[in-house]
A protein has these predicted regions:
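A short, charge-rich alpha-helical start-of-domain segment used by transcription regulators
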Residues: 2-27, 40
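C-terminal flanking helix
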Residues: 22, 26, 47, 119, ...
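Residues within helix-turn-helix
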Residues: 37, 136, 147
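Amphipathic alpha-helical segment used for protein-protein interaction
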Residues: 96-127, 131-143, 161
């Protein structure tokens, strides 16, 4: 196959990823961002990492699983930089959820405030669980067993409950 064909195939696959998975990428970045600037930076980092590693996708898992893994790893890697800039207003305070009732909006803001306090791996687990991702797929994304996924999610939910009662 010619270099031109490989390049065309790579670009087509990347365009497809961007078109189909932008909401997923945005959701993961939102969970790790502390400000709107961090959110935008994370999205750019994720897209750059997807572009550079797209040739490494070998169909051993679903495309969405691979994208989640790249997104989460990128966000965790960048979280130290974001913590240094924690004086910014939190993203949950900056972004408005337009189509929600005031009560529901406040519940969502409180949930995101609590999730922001979790460590990066806990954030990834709870985000995937909230997204309705199957335990098997969460295990593939996080590199842990299905049983361990259940145990860790239970612990994170307990931790969030305790944090909300403080």
């Amino acid at each position: 196959m010619s270099t031109k064909s490989n390049t065309d195939l790579r670009e087509a696959m990347f365009r497809d990823v961007v078109e189909r998975y932008t909401p997923l990428i945005a959701k993961v970045c939102y969970m790790y961002a502390r400000s709107l600037d961090d959110f935008n930076d994370l999205q750019q980092e994720v897209l750059a990492n997807l572009w550079t590693s797209i040739d490494g996708f070998a169909n051993r898992s679903k495309l969405s699983t691979w994208i989640y893994r790249v997104c989460i790893n990128t966000c965790i890697t960048c979280s130290a930089r974001m913590r240094r800039h924690s004086e910014h207003e939190s993203l949950s305070e900056q972004m408005s959820l337009i189509d929600e009732s005031p009560e529901r909006l406040e519940q969502l803001r409180e949930m995101y405030r609590l999730i922001e306090r979790l460590d990066p791996l806990e954030k990834a687990l709870i985000m995937l669980w909230l997204d309705g991702t199957a335990y098997d797929e969460i295990g593939q994304i996080m590199g842990i067993t299905k049983a361990n996924v259940g145990i860790r999610i239970h612990r994170v939910k307990d931790k969030l409950t305790k944090m909300s009662n403080e």
